[in-house]
């Protein structure tokens, strides 16, 4: 019985047989009572029941809610060996003794038929007695899983053979089923000895098992061959070691029908079951073994993913435990899987406990109903009669799983979470009422879903969350009345819902030994390829996938009455239902259910264009019909859950006829979607086929009868190859259908690799079109080929299996040509992917039709539903042919033999079948991937598709960006339906019909309240795809109108599916600009999936967001990359489920939470961040809370934005529009004229010129070839332009000219010598005169006829002229200082400016003052004294001229005073500064302000009064007083917390001020003693003065620093800790690094903060006085006990060591560079009180300055001179001589560090000599004796360089005359200083 059944139905069996342990394990194996030893299920038992967790693959139903838990052990499964050992089997395949198949309780397996067992069901051969539990001798049983049924025996009951004409009584069946429910530990009825085929499969334990059941069996088998991902739970023997995505097992857990996600399972995901090493070979186990404990549990919530809003999911309050898990009661978030397996399904509503604000999309599920009643019934209209066939909701409930209009799981990122291991195979229904009386729970207010996990808010990502059929939460069509699990197919489960639903159809059990199973499948002709109609006797409201998924295209399953008639065996009430229109060219996908019995089974596959698909498996002797009913309703599920289901199905072995039935139309995305897989009982490992059995499957495809023959090896043997030949003759009823000439399926054993492609070989489906069908036109009679059995294998592509064979369905286009896709699965990277289990996606056939004319086109659908082998041209043909609607008919109903490699996925293709691919479009592909445990090609492909979609499609605008990628389209045009872009309609379907269909579909959809405006819009316009308004996925109805209008529109997602298949463009393809832009945009994302098979967690491959994703996540295979993207606590390769201890619920990915795509379900707000799925309390956001992440093509892009600010949604990247390209495009810097190129280069250099990069840029100028007068003139003009407009930088530009003049050679043009100086002089004169002209023009009155200027314009001109003139004057003065201009020129300029002093011009006077201040000192020499006197007399007179403005008069007085003051500026004229100087000045200014703030009367008062000197050490320093310590440390401690750069600058400032304020206010010294906040001074020193100072102050302050301060960025206590400051304040400027240790207390304590990198901020403060003040305090504080801790406390008498003196002296000079306070330096030197150290100090200073800037060298020279002046007395000549002697002695070493040391030393000595501090003769003698060895300097040439630079400096400073006099007086012979050859000294040679 399906777990979804209402409890009332199940109560009998359930209560009776329910295992107590099951409650704890969501999916404890029901079948094996032993399995769940304890209620908690957490114990090892859980592992035992890895399958037993009732997530057994059968549990496929779990998600669906219908699967028998018992399925866990393969009964008597040889593989499972019936090992009761809990973990004996991978994932504890089934430790418990296999119970009868019934015990396993294939939820859906049990037909609804009366309990009476109808022997007829069994095929000839022994009655399908299911072996007793685990009787090894008996034929292997199949563990029942969704859709897995012992063919003749259901849960111990044999179903009477039903004629197709008489629909089964579903209610009756349900009741019976309930009685026999597999819940019972013991089969309700004696189990027939004959193994049910399923049972056998179980035994087979291998690929043969039904989808889920098979996997369960595998578990039983203990073989690691569990379904790849466990989605399919296909037991792949070959893959035993394979790690199927562990997630899938969880999927199988699917028991939680729906919202298991939210449930925090009692964590006991039995670790054993989950071999954590998901990456381990047995990852599959994980999925299976996880049973209850699967971390999947953290299924975010049953969020509806698809557009199917129809079924509202219950809201869950994250914090609420909706209902206690079965026995366990409510599971607390941290708890182990508390829910009984069964509960899992129920949990759906609260599954996740993840509170989701999501309005429950599914109304509360009534007993047994998971996913809630379906809102809408699927209406199938007969194309001809237009009569509606509505399936009863109850029935739909039974299959509710199949039809999920709810959001597709694929979008639920949670899919990764999806696998709720605990979901019982039974629908969670049991508890829904009791525990979830009201599905509505209010989610936590947090509206932001964890961004990293993208889970549809309403869908539970876990595949198992929903009843099997339910699939992901696509529960849109769940009929509450139905007792059976409803809800979208679990993602992890492949069509399990359908399988479960198969109970509706009678599953006959062919004799295990052998027999021909005749399966008659009537394919619903669902135009959209949705599950057109289930064969349910009652009318199922099957919502076309398109509808449920996307209202965009109403999908209607049309079954021509004739076909329906043909479908005599069909149980479905479809016959009863009236089909309004005849689907012309409807493709019905035959579903082949291949079950291997001992004998070759014969499967007759009839696909008729009927809404119902029936499959009957008959023993060779007897033919039973198994009506495959699947709710078409689930179309949406197909899309969303399709993927899940597909995966599940595939994984579960689509072999389940049930699943076939259910998903044939919907989930399989095609009739095949419900493929029955024949699983060979034998291990797939057997390479050879001992016996080949022929399987003949007659199928009617699109009204044509097709017989498929498959040669299968003996069940006991691995099926080496299955050859299926399909001969198909078109029936007159479906003239439009092409004939399937032959379908050749060859699957070889994995070992037989000779002809196999490693990844997979496509099964070739050859369709021969006997006649042309004109779909858009009235159907043309096609040649009818009577059932021709064609064994021709047009192409046998061997499917290479990694462990499983991927069955690739190649869909032949109508042409005879067989479409082969060698590469169809090349994209399948995952081993499991090979197991593409006839993914629904693969089953794309549903809505795709082969273009009529695309005879040559090849379409291959791999299990992933991909078109691999099609050439790009082919794709273009199929996709783009606008002239003819093309719909490749692919029947994705592929069921792969699990591990056996037995692939009997028959893709029935009807050329005309317009069945919409259910979700195959996008989802199919993804689904398949999902199914593959590891990673699905499809998934990768999906990833690529999504990425490509990002590049090409919806991103064009925000609206599209927020939308899910064409979900609607998905329904409409599924991946496989690409060619079918416009489904053809052979019959003339009027637009009216199409509208009617739309209305019907819309009506069904409308029944479910649209979740948002998008849905509403979709419903309003269901067909968005076709140009003319017809939905692409619409049934052929739509295409009827379109015959004339061939313009086709393809959804982006649809087209993108070909992205990876077709990488090469056609030869003649023209890449237009718009295409090129898209291509370029796509490059960044196209191959992401290659390295990240599992798309980023936030971006689940849309189609399969179900359990498979969960499995993947659970597995270690998960890419580290993907996990690393998650900010959450989960380690990159770690399964979050393992982290439950951390409070994360199992299966809950860090960011996972409902993710509502932007407006997808605006009402569904993800509650708080789900911690681990259950509301563990708002955890720290594991991921950016920013943009809601969606599971759509944009998801990955959004997912990557993990660092967005909260609340910000990054705008998706949209493809850039191609820029208009001019014929002759402009290229930057490209100039034809060489001269212009040079000028541009020079201008660029000048624009970047600054004092800092002067030297570097000057080298670039030299690199420019200035080789003619024109270029040279241009350079000078540019320099003048820059200088005149930037007067502040005149000095720099003059220096530039000076260097340039020295570097440029003399040029000659026309025999005329051209020199730079000459051109420069001309330019100066020109500019000077030009300035006068401009002034005159600005002042003159306009003459008549001239344009009159306004006063503003005139003033503007005047200002501009004045600025230029002043700049010119200043530049001239600077050039003169550089000796570029002569003194005579200067005098001429002055005279010109004085001009008419009687009537002075203010601008001229101002310029004169500026010039005098610039060059006055140089021209005021004795020889020019007369001139200067006359100038200043005039200036004095002008200064008293009241006609001048006061500003100008004061300027004149300043110039006069300047001359009187010997040209010494009262204040330094500020010129350009380097950045570090700017920082220093800013620091000083700030320090001065804080000093005023914290100190007493005045800054220097204490020092002058003898009080403790101020300390300018870093304010708030760590060594401040104890009171200050806390405040000071606050800043330090804050920063590490902010991780450095994150800290707000204002915070730093605030903290620093807090520290300062605290220290100042808390302990303010009394009196007028100033208190410095520095480390040594201020409070600390004040304390020492007033009383004893704790000697440990400094160490104590330092010790508490957290960690090593050098590494942690610390907020500057003075608030000045910008990065630039830290960068610029290098060790050179950071005096603290060297002197602070002494000041503080010991080098050791200070070491923590001394280094500049650590405390660059120390440089911020003005440390000018620190060294001095520290030391000066010594004499003041003799009372302080001497100690090493504090320098200030040292007694004054103590003589400092040499090292100490060096450190202090360096500290003092560094302070001087910053503060430029010579007095402070003098005080520091006096405090050293060591005159003998002065020469060494000078030596240290000079050597140190070699590595400093020119400015600092100038400062040092002036300092030395001033300190040596007699009036100062700090230094004397002897000190200087000895000091320079030491420098010269070490010059050879200094050159290594500072190559230009000789130049710098010469500059310093030149200035000292100029000031007469030392004579040139003395210096020359020092040079001669200099070097480590006396005389070495001369030998090396360094001495000559030093002397040459001395002379050069003297000449620059004092002029050539002064130098000549000096040389004469010194009596030097410069030749003696020249180095021996070959060494040269150019500098000195200039003076010789």
Curated annotation (Swiss-Prot):
Stretches the record annotates as EIF4E-binding: 1048-1093
Biased composition (Low complexity): 603-630, 840-850
GO molecular function terms attached to this record: mRNA binding; translation initiation factor activity
Alphabetized PROSITE patterns for the sequence: MI
Gene3D superfamilies: 1.25.40.180
Family named by the database record: Belongs to the eukaryotic initiation factor 4G family.
Protein name (database record): Eukaryotic translation initiation factor 4G
Annotated source species: Cucumis melo (Muskmelon)
């Amino acid at each position: 019985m399906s777990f979804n059944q209402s409890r009332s139905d199940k109560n009998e069996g359930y209560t009776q047989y329910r295992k107590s342990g099951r409650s704890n394990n969501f999916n404890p194996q029901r079948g094996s009572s032993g399995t769940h030893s304890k209620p908690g299920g957490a114990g090892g038992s859980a592992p035992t029941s890895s399958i037993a967790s009732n997530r057994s693959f059968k549990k496929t139903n779990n998600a669906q809610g219908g699967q028998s838990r018992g399925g866990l052990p393969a009964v008597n499964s040889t593989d499972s060996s019936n090992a009761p050992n809990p973990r004996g089997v991978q994932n504890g395949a089934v430790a418990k003794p296999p119970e009868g198949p019934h015990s396993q309780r294939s939820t859906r397996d049990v037909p609804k038929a009366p309990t009476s067992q109808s022997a007829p069901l069994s095929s000839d051969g022994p009655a399908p007695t299911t072996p007793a539990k685990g009787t090894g001798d008996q034929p292997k049983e199949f563990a029942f899983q969704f859709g897995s049924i012992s063919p003749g025996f259901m849960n111990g009951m044999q179903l009477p053979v039903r004629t197709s004409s008489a629909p089964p009584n579903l209610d009756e069946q349900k009741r019976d089923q309930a009685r026999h429910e597999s819940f019972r530990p013991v089969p309700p009825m004696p189990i027939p000895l004959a193994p049910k085929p399923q049972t056998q499969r179980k035994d087979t334990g291998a690929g043969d098992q039904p989808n889920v059941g098979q996997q369960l069996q595998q578990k039983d088998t203990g073989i690691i061959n569990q379904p790849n991902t466990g989605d399919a739970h296909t037991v792949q023997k070959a893959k035993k070691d394979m790690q199927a995505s562990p997630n899938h097992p969880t999927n199988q857990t699917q028991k939680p029908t729906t919202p298991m996600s939210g449930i925090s399972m009692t964590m006991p995901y039995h670790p054993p079951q989950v071999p954590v090493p998901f990456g381990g070979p047995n990852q599959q186990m994980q999925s299976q073994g996880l049973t209850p404990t699967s971390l999947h549990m953290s299924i975010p919530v049953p969020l509806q993913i698809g557009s199917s809003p129809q079924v509202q999911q219950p809201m869950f309050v994250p914090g609420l435990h909706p209902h206690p898990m079965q026995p366990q009661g409510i599971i607390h978030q941290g708890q182990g899987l508390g829910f009984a397996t069964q509960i899992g399904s129920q949990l759906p509503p609260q599954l996740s406990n993840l509170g989701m604000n999501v309005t429950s999309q599914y109304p509360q599920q009534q007993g047994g109903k998971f996913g809630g009643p379906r809102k809408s019934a699927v209406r199938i209209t007969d194309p001809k009669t237009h009569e509606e066939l509505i399936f009863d909701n109850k029935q739909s409930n039974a299959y509710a799983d199949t039809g999920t209009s709810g959001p597709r799981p694929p979008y639920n990122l949670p899919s990764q979470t999806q696998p709720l291991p605990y979901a019982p195979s039974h629908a969670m229904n049991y508890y829904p009422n009791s525990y979830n009386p009201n599905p509505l729970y209010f989610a936590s207010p947090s509206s932001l879903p964890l961004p990293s996990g993208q889970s549809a808010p309403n869908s539970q990502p876990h595949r198992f969350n929903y009843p099997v059929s339910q699939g992901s939460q696509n529960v849109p069509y769940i009929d509450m009345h139905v007792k059976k699990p409803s809800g979208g197919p679990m993602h992890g489960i492949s069509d399990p819902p359908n399988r479960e639903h198969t109970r509706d159809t009678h599953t006959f059990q062919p004799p295990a030994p052998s027999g021909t199973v005749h399966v008659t499948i009537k394919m619903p002709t669902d135009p959209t390829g949705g599950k057109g109609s289930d064969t349910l006797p009652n009318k199922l409201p099957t919502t076309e996938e398109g509808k449920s998924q996307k209202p965009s295209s109403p999908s209607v399953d049309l079954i021509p009455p004739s076909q329906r008639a043909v479908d005599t065996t069909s149980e479905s009430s479809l016959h009863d239902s009236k089909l309004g229109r005849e689907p012309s060219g409807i493709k019905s996908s035959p579903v082949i259910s291949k079950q291997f019995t001992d004998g070759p089974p014969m499967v007759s596959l009839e696909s008729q264009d009927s809404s119902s698909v029936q499959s009957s498996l008959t023993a060779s002797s007897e033919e039973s019909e198994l009506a495959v009913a699947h709710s078409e309703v689930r179309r949406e599920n197909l899309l969303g859950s399709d993927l899940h289901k597909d995966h599940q199905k595939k994984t579960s072995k689509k072999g389940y006829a049930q699943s076939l039935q259910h998903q044939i139309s919907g989930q399989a995305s095609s009739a095949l979607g419900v493929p029955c897989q024949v699983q060979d009982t034998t291990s797939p490992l057997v390479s050879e086929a001992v016996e080949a059995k022929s399987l003949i499957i007659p199928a009617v495809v699109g009204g044509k009868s097709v017989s498929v023959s498959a040669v299968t090896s003996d069940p006991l043997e691995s099926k080496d190859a299955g050859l299926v030949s399909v001969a198909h003759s078109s029936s007159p009823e479906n003239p439009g259908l092409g004939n399937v000439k032959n379908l050749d399926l060859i699957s070889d054993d994995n070992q037989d690799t000779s002809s196999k492609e490693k990844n997979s070989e496509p099964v070739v489906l050859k369709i021969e079109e006997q006649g042309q069908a004109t779909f858009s036109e009235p159907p043309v009679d096609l040649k009818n080929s009577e059932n021709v059995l064609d064994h021709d294998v047009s192409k046998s592509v061997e499917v290479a299996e990694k462990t499983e064979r991927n069955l690739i369905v190649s869909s032949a286009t109508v042409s005879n040509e067989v479409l082969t896709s060698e590469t169809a699965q090349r994209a399948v990277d995952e081993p499991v992917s090979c197991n593409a289990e006839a993914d629904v996606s693969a089953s794309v056939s549903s809505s795709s039709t082969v273009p009529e004319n695309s005879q040559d086109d090849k379409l291959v659908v791999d299990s992933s539903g991909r078109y691999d082998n099609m050439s790009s041209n082919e794709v273009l043909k199929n996709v783009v042919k606008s002239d003819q609607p093309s719909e490749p008919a692919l029947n994705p109903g592929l069921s792969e033999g699990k591990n056996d490699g037995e692939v009997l996925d028959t893709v029935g293709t009807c050329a005309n079948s317009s069945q919409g691919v259910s979700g195959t479009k996008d989802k199919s592909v993804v689904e398949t991937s999902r199914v593959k445990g590891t990673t699905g090609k499809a998934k990768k492909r999906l990833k690529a598709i999504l990425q490509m979609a990002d590049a090409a499609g919806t991103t064009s605008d925000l609206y599209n960006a927020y939308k899910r990628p064409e979900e609607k389209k998905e329904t409409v045009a599924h991946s496989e339906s690409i060619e079918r872009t416009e489904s053809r309609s052979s019959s003339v379907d009027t637009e009216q019909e199409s509208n009617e269909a739309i209305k019907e579909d819309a009506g069904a959809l409308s029944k479910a309240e649209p979740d948002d405006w998008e849905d509403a819009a979709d419903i309003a316009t269901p067909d968005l795809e076709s140009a003319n308004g017809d939905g692409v996925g619409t049934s052929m109805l739509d295409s009827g109108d379109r015959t004339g209008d061939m313009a086709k529109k393809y959804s982006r997602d649809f087209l993108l599916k070909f992205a990876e298949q077709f990488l090469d463009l056609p030869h003649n393809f023209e890449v237009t600009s718009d295409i090129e832009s898209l291509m370029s945009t796509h490059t960044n994302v196209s191959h992401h999936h290659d390295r990240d098979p599992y798309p980023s967690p936030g971006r689940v491959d849309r189609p399969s967001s179900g359990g498979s994703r969960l499995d993947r996540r659970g597995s270690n295979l998960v890419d580290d990359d993907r996990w690393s993207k998650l900010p959450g606590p989960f380690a990159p390769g770690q399964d979050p489920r393992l982290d439950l201890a951390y409070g994360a619920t199992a299966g809950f990915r860090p960011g996972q939470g409902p993710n509502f795509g932007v407006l997808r379900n605006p009402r569904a707000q993800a509650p708080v961040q789900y911690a681990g799925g259950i509301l563990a309390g708002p955890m720290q956001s594991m991921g950016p809370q920013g943009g809601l992440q969606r599971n759509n093509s944009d998801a990955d892009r959004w997912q990557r934005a993990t660092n967005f600010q909260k609340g910000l949604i990054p705008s998706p990247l949209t493809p850039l529009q191609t820029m208009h390209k001019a014929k002759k495009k402009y290229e930057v810097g490209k100039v034809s004229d060489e001269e212009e190129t040079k000028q541009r280069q020079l201008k660029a250099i000048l624009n970047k010129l600054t004092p800092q990069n002067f030297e570097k840029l000057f080298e670039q100028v030299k690199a420019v070839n200035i080789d003619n007068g024109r270029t040279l003139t241009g350079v000078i003009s540019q320099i003048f332009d820059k200088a005149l407009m930037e007067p502040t930088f005149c000095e720099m530009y003059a220096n530039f000219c000076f260097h340039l003049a020295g570097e440029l050679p003399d040029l000659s043009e026309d025999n005329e010598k051209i020199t730079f100086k000459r051109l420069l002089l001309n330019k100066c004169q020109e500019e000077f005169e030009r300035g006068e002209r401009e002034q005159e023009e600005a002042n003159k009155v306009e003459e008549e006829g001239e344009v009159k200027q306004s006063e503003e314009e005139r003033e503007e001109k005047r200002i501009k002229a004045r600025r230029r003139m002043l700049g010119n004057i200043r530049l001239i003065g600077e050039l003169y200082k550089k000796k570029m201009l002569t003194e005579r020129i200067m005098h001429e300029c002055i005279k010109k400016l004085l001009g008419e002093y009687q009537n002075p011009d203010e601008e001229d006077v101002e310029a004169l003052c500026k010039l005098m201040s610039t060059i006055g000192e140089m021209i005021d020499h004795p020889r020019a004294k007369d001139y200067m006197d006359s100038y200043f007399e005039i200036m004095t007179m002008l200064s008293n001229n009241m006609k001048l403005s006061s500003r100008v008069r004061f300027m004149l007085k300043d110039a006069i005073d300047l001359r009187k003051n010997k040209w010494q500026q009262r204040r330094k004229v500020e010129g350009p500064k380097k950045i570090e100087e700017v920082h220093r000045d800013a620091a000083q200014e700030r320090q001065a302000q804080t000093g005023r703030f914290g100190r007493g009367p005045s800054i220097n008062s204490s020092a002058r009064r003898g009080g403790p000197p101020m300390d300018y050490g870093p304010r708030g320093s760590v060594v401040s007083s104890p009171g200050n310590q806390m405040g000071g440390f606050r800043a330090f401690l804050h920063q590490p917390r902010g991780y450095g750069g994150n800290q707000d600058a204002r915070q730093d400032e605030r903290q620093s001020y807090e520290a300062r304020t605290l220290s100042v206010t808390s302990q303010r010294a009394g009196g007028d003693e100033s208190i410095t906040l520095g480390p040594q001074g201020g409070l600390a020193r004040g304390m020492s003065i007033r009383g004893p100072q704790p000697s440990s102050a400094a160490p104590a302050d330092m010790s508490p620093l957290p960690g090593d301060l050098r590494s942690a960025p610390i907020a500057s206590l003075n608030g000045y800790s910008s990065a630039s400051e830290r960068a610029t304040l290098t060790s050179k400027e950071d005096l603290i690094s060297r002197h602070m240790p002494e000041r503080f207390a010991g080098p050791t304590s200070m070491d923590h903060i001394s280094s500049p990198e650590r405390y660059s901020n120390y440089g911020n403060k003005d440390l000018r006085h620190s060294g001095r003040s520290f030391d000066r305090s010594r004499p003041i504080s003799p009372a302080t006990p001497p100690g090493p801790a504090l320098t200030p406390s040292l007694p004054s008498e103590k003589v400092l060591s040499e090292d100490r003196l060096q450190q202090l002296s360096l500290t003092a000079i560094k302070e001087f560079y910053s503060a430029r306070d010579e007095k402070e330096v003098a005080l520091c030197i006096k405090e050293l009180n060591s005159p003998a150290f002065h020469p060494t100090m000078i030596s240290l200073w000079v050597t140190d300055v070699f590595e400093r800037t020119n400015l600092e060298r100038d400062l040092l020279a002036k300092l030395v001179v001033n300190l040596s002046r007699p009036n100062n007395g700090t230094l004397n000549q002897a000190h200087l001589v000895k000091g320079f002697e030491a420098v010269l002695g070490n010059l050879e070493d200094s050159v290594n560090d500072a190559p230009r040391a000789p130049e710098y030393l010469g500059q310093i000595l030149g200035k000292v000599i100029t000031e007469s501090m030392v004579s040139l003769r003395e210096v020359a003698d020092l040079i001669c004796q200099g070097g480590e060895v006396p005389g070495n300097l001369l030998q090396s040439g360094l001495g000559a360089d030093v002397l040459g630079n001395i002379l050069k400096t003297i000449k620059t400073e004092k002029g050539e005359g002064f130098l000549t006099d000096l040389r004469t007086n010194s009596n030097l012979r410069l030749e003696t200083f020249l180095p021996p050859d070959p060494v040269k000294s150019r500098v000195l040679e200039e003076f010789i």
